[in-house]
Design a protein with these regions (language model features):
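Short His-centered aromatic/hydrophobic patch
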Residues: 56-62, 81-84
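Aromatic "clamp/platform" in nucleotide-sugar-dependent glycosyltransferases that forms part
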Residues: 230, 249
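Helix-loop-beta element that forms the nucleotide-linked donor phosphate-binding surface
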Residues: 127-147
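Conserved acidic donor-binding segment of nucleotide-sugar-dependent glycosyltransferases
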Residues: 281-293, 301-304
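Membrane-proximal helix-turn-helix segments that form the acceptor-binding/catalytic region
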Residues: 99-119
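A conserved mid-protein helix/loop that constitutes part of the nucleotide-sugar donor-binding site
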Residues: 14-21, 165, 169-191, 207-213
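Nucleotide-activated donor-binding/catalytic signature segment of Leloir-type glycosyltransferases, i.e.
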Residues: 213-229
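Short hydrophobic beta-strand element within catalytic cores of glycosyltransferases
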Residues: 266-269
């Protein structure tokens, strides 16, 4: 069977990790990755390759696939929802412009979702919200991410030592991931963190990185943070911090937290969809309300 995996671009994030694991689970099938940024996610490309299953993993790729409403696709279309990004508008002011943008995105997503043969939600929370937001009739299946200890990379030959930092935050730098909340929490208790020599390692790249660097300088905590940049297979670097911090505003079902649980790491995470689903029964985790700087700061002060 020929399975086409559609992404926006090849990256080091959780979406691409999901695709890699999907491909590994189909050793007897012919699999190929198509990138929307290279204009590859079209009906013509799918039909030319003979795709029997078209598995889209990003909205941009799905939009490119269905851009021509008259093109007829020969394959069965699956779309995996890696977090409901419409939630972004829950954190923005209710201005007329934002209300229009939310309506436009919701309308577009409803149109695209209804053209899929199957929609995969990673959590029960997302499945319920997909039905609530996009239509009760949609063919939604819940297929949680999973990770086993046998697949974990050994923490050898890393750039930093094990437990070298008090905290580590690994994520693409964008609004969703909430690094600004973490920087503000560090600033809130900077005297204590400085006295106890508790530094935070940030790993990742992205459009929000420059803003976060500037915010750290503006709040006077540059000496308490280190930015390592983007690192391939960065999950293993959670061992370089004694506690992993995940301050996201929303998530799908993050591989990073699944890996942290598999490694038995201590975790401080925001109580958002995705994080909550992964950590609800994990004893080495504590959670704080989304965007609650004071609560996160208190937990950082008391962390070992």
């Amino acid at each position: 069977m020929r399975i086409a995996y559609l992404v926006d671009k090849r990256s080091v994030g959780g979406g691409m990790e999901y695709v890699r694991r999907q491909i590994a689970a189909h050793p007897n099938d012919e699999c190929r990755v198509f990138e929307a940024d290279r204009g590859e996610c079209t009906v013509a490309a799918m039909n030319a390759w003979g795709a029997e299953i078209v598995h889209a993993n990003h909205l941009k790729a799905l939009l490119q696939l269905f851009r021509n409403p008259f093109a007829r696709l020969g394959g069965y279309v699956v779309f995996t929802v890696h977090g409901i990004h419409l939630r972004r508008f829950d954190f923005l002011p209710n201005t007329p412009a934002n209300l229009v943008k939310r309506w436009a995105r919701l309308s577009l997503e409803r149109y695209l979702y209804r053209k899929c043969d199957r929609i995969v939600a990673l959590t029960e929370t997302d499945a319920a919200d997909i039905h609530r937001l996009y239509g009760r009739h949609l063919p939604v299946a819940i297929e949680p991410n999973s990770i086993g200890r046998s697949t974990l990379r050994s923490a050898e030959g890393l750039r930093y030592g094990e437990g070298q930092f008090a905290f580590v935050c690994i994520a693409r730098f964008e609004f969703q991931k909430g690094q600004d909340v973490l920087i503000k929490a560090i600033a809130r208790v900077h005297e204590t963190l400085r006295r106890l020599e508790k530094k935070t390692l940030f790993i990742g790249g992205g459009p929000f990185l420059r803003h976060i660097r500037c915010l750290a300088e503006e709040l006077g905590v540059s000496d308490l943070v280190e930015f390592a940049g983007e690192i391939y297979d960065a999950g293993v670097y959670m061992t370089c911090g004694r506690t992993l911090i995940a301050p996201s505003r929303w998530e799908g079902m993050p591989y990073l937290l699944l890996e942290a649980v598999a490694r038995g790491r201590r975790i401080i995470a925001s109580d958002c969809p995705g994080n909550r689903d992964v950590l609800k029964d994990y004893s080495l985790s504590t959670m704080f309300p989304v965007e609650d700087v004071s609560s996160l700061a208190e937990q950082m002060q008391s962390a070992d």
